[in-house]
Amino acid sequence: MKREFIETPSFTKKWFSLGFNDEDLAELEQFLVENPEAGDMMVGTGGLRKLRFAFKGKGKSGSARVCYVDFAAFEKDYLIQVFS
């Protein structure tokens, strides 16, 4: 299954300011392709999910919370926000 990932400008800015790189982003995207309903649905948001994602080789302190929306019918994921 091919998915398109769309990042908000604030997601991209914060992603790199947290020290993550393009390889980490590819790892996150692959995880979401394999697990499109991962994370907890945030009540009252219409589908926004919050996911704790630990990156390989970075340990527990290298994890982040990612807020995203999956539109399965359109094969699109919107990466909304990231924080640690």
Task: State where each predicted segment sits.
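Arg/Lys-rich, positively charged N-terminal/basic patches that mediate binding to nucleic acids
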Residues: 1-24
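Short, surface-exposed coil-to-beta transition loops
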Residues: 61-66
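Enriched for short, Lys/Arg-rich terminal
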Residues: 69-84
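A short, surface-exposed loop/turn module that caps and links secondary-structure elements
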Residues: 31-58
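Conserved catalytic network of the ASCE P-loop NTPase/AAA+ motor domain
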Residues: 58-60, 72
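Anionic group-transfer/hydrolysis microenvironments
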Residues: 9, 52, 83
